[in-house]
Amino acid sequence: MKKQNNGLIKNPFLWLLFIFFLVTGFQYFYSGNNSGGSQQINYTELVQEITDGNVKELTYQPNGSVIEVSGVYKNPKTSKEGTGIQFFTPSVTKVEKFTSTILPADTTVSELQKLATDHKAEVTVKHESSSGIWINLLVSIVPFGILFFFLFSMMGNMGGGNGRNPMSFGRSKAKAANKEDIKVRFSDVAGAEEEKQELVEVVEFLKDPKRFTKLGARIPAGVLLEGPPGTGKTLLAKAVAGEAGVPFFSISGSDFVEMFVGVGASRVRSLFEDAKKAAPAIIFIDEIDAVGRQRGVGLGGGNDEREQTLNQLLIEMDGFEGNEGIIVIAATNRSDVLDPALLRPGRFDRKVLVGRPDVKGREAILKVHAKNKPLAEDVDLKLVAQQTPGFVGADLENVLNEAALVAARRNKSIIDASDIDEAEDRVIAGPSKKDKTVSQKERELVAYHEAGHTIVGLVLSNARVVHKVTIVPRGRAGGYMIALPKEDQMLLSKEDMKEQLAGLMGGRVAEEIIFNVQTTGASNDFEQATQMARAMVTEYGMSEKLGPVQYEGNHAMLGAQSPQKSISEQTAYEIDEEVRSLLNEARNKAAEIIQSNRETHKLIAEALLKYETLDSTQIKALYETGKMPEAVEEESHALSYDEVKSKMNDEK
């Protein structure tokens, strides 16, 4: 409770609310006390009261630009308003005094005095009170002063990392690292050998710029690292700074943009000023698309805060003043939405594509991340690399980390191949749900569904090999089949894609042939198949009818040119027809394969119902010999205590 109370006390908004009510109450009571139970009347009412002879005393007192008039009634008046704060129903009170305010015009004051004298009212004129002026001034200024104080305090807190000084709100939020603090080297970055070769010259520029400038070469102003998330763009930037031995300033693109106009541009100026003082230096901007999107094409357009920030960044990178010794390295996975002025030579001279690693790169990455993990002798990192096509560095690190967690969960002292195999499944499909209650009918349906995918994949194995099939539920899937490419592929042929389409259709076709039903289990298969078939027709020009024309590209996100419809209704209809034709062709091919291999299909399904998971060796044996490998056959016997405990640990 004490911690919660301390948090409430430190909350600036609660203090602001408290001060507001305090000042409001002070003003209210101050005005109430000054009135002393009097009634406020206007000039017309004042003249009427004097004319009626109901004024006993009248006092004039100048107060700044007005004259305050107060007086006493001869006959007190009744009022239901009263003064001060009333907590109950207001009572009828007698008002003996009144106040009014008039402008200091000579004719008005003299006429009012003459009128009061004629009606036998006692008139008194007082000099202006200096203390009253200061009190009124204080009451007017104090609330605004308190408000500004809290605003500046909150702005100082929002400045983050620059102390509590409110004037640091526009300072850069970049994290600065000295060359001694950067321990990352090129040897720590695996699977990006070509990318490192592109960055070697940048390191040489920073180490020995005279070697290049004497030949008339210009130091690159910036390097743009583009690639999918998790490929190691940030790590590469740190490695460049580490190899060059220069200070490293890192900041996210979103840190520049705030709700206050001009703050982003101020932070850009501050960042480059700090880098100039430490030159030679590297500025790393992560996710630069947050601030570098094309100007004038977002929602609302116009010269908004983001555009001002981008303009300042353009000027700093290649404006009137040079930035000798400063290299900007930026990372993004959406270079298509960046402003063309940012991508031109002179700003980002080098564009390095950091792609997904090949099998050798994946093996090297696994070796780097396995340095601090005890691995059993049966762990083959080369095999793991072959089983993880398309994985980036972050995915591979996650696989080994999950394997370590699985081994710890099973009370092991080292990580073996079964732990890594389980980790791969968890990363690809999610955690297993062995405790999930599934009816026998559904288990059979899932088994034949996955066996359908498997048998089609076994027959059409020119490009891909069936690696594993299981009916253990994981994530949203009731089961799944994994088919891996025989080797890393940069390009896919039309036949390769048709084989994949047939494999995706194998599950639904098996349901229809064996059980004569259609279930929702094939929804994800259809989604993938439709996307692939549409890409074949609209992007890759693989339709004989429509020809080698690209009808659709990558749909732009907010910040780039919005896609406009550039095809006719007839062409759109023909595209749909071609997509449907490809999918029907794949469906017929899958049906033909399953009908021709009914016995093998049944064997795989029955093995799945018995063992739940089959690896590539077991699948191959069933396909070629019709039997499971002898090593897998298990004898039925009563389990000992140690065997029961071991089995429980394996199932955790």
Swiss-Prot record:
Topology in membrane: Multi-pass membrane protein
Regions that span the bilayer: 12-32, 132-152
UniProt-annotated stretches for the region Disordered: 628-652
Molecular functions (GO terms): ATP binding; ATP hydrolysis activity; ATP-dependent peptidase activity; metalloendopeptidase activity; zinc ion binding
Extracellular-side positions: 33-131
Binding of ATP, residues: G227, P228, P229, G230, T231, G232, K233, T234
Gene Ontology terms: biological process: protein catabolic process; proteolysis
Cofactor(s) listed in the protein's UniProt record: Zn(2+)
Cytoplasmic side: 1-11, 153-652
Source species: Streptococcus pneumoniae (strain ATCC BAA-255 / R6)
Subunit structure and binding partners: Homohexamer.
Presence of the UniProt keyword Cell membrane in the record: yes
Protein name: ATP-dependent zinc metalloprotease FtsH
